[in-house]
A protein has these predicted regions:
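Short, low-complexity, Lys/Arg-enriched N-terminal segments of secretory-pathway carbohydrate enzymes
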Residues: 1-17, 49-51
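N-terminal binding-site loop/beta-alpha segment at the start of enzyme catalytic domains
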Residues: 20-158, 163-167, 171-174
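Glycine-rich, positively charged active-site loop/lid region within alpha/beta enzyme cores that binds
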Residues: 88, 96, 165-198, 306-337
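Short, acidic/polar
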Residues: 103-116, 205-219, 270-278
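Beta/alpha (TIM)-barrel catalytic core signal, keyed to glycine-rich beta->alpha loops juxtaposed to Asp/Glu
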Residues: 57-75, 108, 132, 214, ...
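Active-site mouth loops of central-metabolism enzymes
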Residues: 95-107, 194-210, 239-240
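Acidic (Asp/Glu)-rich catalytic clusters
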Residues: 118, 142-150, 218-222, 278-283, ...
Length: 337
């Protein structure tokens, strides 16, 4: 990516990071992941075009040096030894489009997507969680405004949270399923621009995944997305619901029977839960894994996941290789100050 612009830190402020340092960090990070890939051997390649954050084999992610600091990651796929990464290997992570940590605007979101498209990036990763649907809306609007060629553009989104109008949420859901920490006004909410008329309801069941998928298509205003990632199934209740509750099976059905998606994926931070999910489901269940913040210069907890994915032929989209911006002058690590 261009070293002519300063990398934007996680708090949505332009940091005075020296361009040369940003470039060096990117090269170091990519070299680390290339070394792992060449030692392990080639994995499976994601179906054409398209880290987010930032799938198939070991991926390396780095921050897009635009004013918005949307994150990106690269998939090494089954590249032969000596094959250099290109812009085609990058995925733009779209949580910053919703204004993570600080308020942003639709115009900034469009500028970010336009810069990515101009650079040749054609793959985008978003989620309902990012601004309670705001990232999806802004991404869809930006792709249309920028005239993106959707025949060459791939979009990934996530399932596990259903965004419901407040008047639709039941008393029982408010008691046990609403993720209150992600509602505007709560000190834990990191998306200040999120709408105030919806609530995030945790739902990792098959019907919940199906509704989340349909709602995402409506917000994006797209006929389809390429991949659905199970998002943050990192406690025992969510994990059990995704498996025993039929969530994983529903995604496989959407891919294999209905041809509604091309990839069944994971979008998680905890490497231990990623590996459990892989091991507790049959080979061929997952096409890719997005693992955030678990394989970078500060944290290598995800090493075992990389080897397990290599063994199974599962692509890895490695997100957060700059440790939530901490390695490039930011003030957050693992999404916390």
């Amino acid at each position: 990516m261009s070293a002519r612009r300063s990398t934007r830190a996680s708090n949505d402020r332009v940091e005075s990071l020296a361009p040369n340092l940003a470039h060096v960090l990117a090269v170091i990070a990519l070299a680390v992941f290339a070394a792992i890939h060449f030692r392990a051997g080639a994995g499976r390649v994601a179906p054409s075009s398209g880290d987010a954050s930032d799938s198939k084999s070991v991926s390396a992610g780095f921050a897009i040096p635009t004013e918005k600091m949307a994150s990106a990651s690269a998939s090494l796929g089954s590249h032969p030894a000596g094959r250099k990464l290109t812009v085609d290997d990058l995925i733009l992570g779209c949580s910053p489009l919703a204004g993570i940590y600080a308020s942003s605007t639709p115009e900034r979101a469009t500028e970010t997507v336009r810069a990515a498209l101009d650079a040749g990036i054609t793959r985008f990763d978003t989620a309902p969680h990012y601004g309670l649907g705001l990232s999806e809306r802004r991404l869809g609007d930006a792709l249309r405004e920028c005239g993106a060629d959707m025949s060459k553009t791939r979009v990934y989104t996530k399932v596990g949270r259903v965004m419901k109008p407040k008047d639709e949420v039941t008393a029982s859901e408010k008691e046990s399923a609403v993720e209150w920490g992600n509602v505007p006004g709560d000190p834990g909410c990191i998306f200040p621009d999120a709408p105030v008329d919806v609530l995030p309801v945790l739902d990792y069941t098959g019907p919940g995944f199906r509704r989340s998928h349909a709602d995402s298509l409506a917000r994006l205003r797209l006929g389809s997305v390429d991949g659905l990632r199970i998002h943050d199934a990192e406690d025992e209740a969510r994990y059990a619901q995704a498996n025993a509750g039929g969530g994983v099976a529903e995604l496989v059905k959407l891919r294999d029977d209905e041809r509604a998606i091309r990839e069944v994926s994971l979008g998680m931070n905890d490497a231990a839960f990623v590996r459990r999910m892989l091991e507790d489901n049959p080979p061929g269940t997952f096409d890719s894994v997005m693992m955030a913040g678990a394989w970078n210069l500060l944290d290598q907890d995800g090493g075992d996941v990389l080897w397990e994915c290599e063994r199974r032929g599962v692509a890895v989209h490695n997100a957060g290789i700059f440790a939530s911006g901490l390695l490039v002058g930011g003030s957050h690590y693992k999404y916390a100050p």
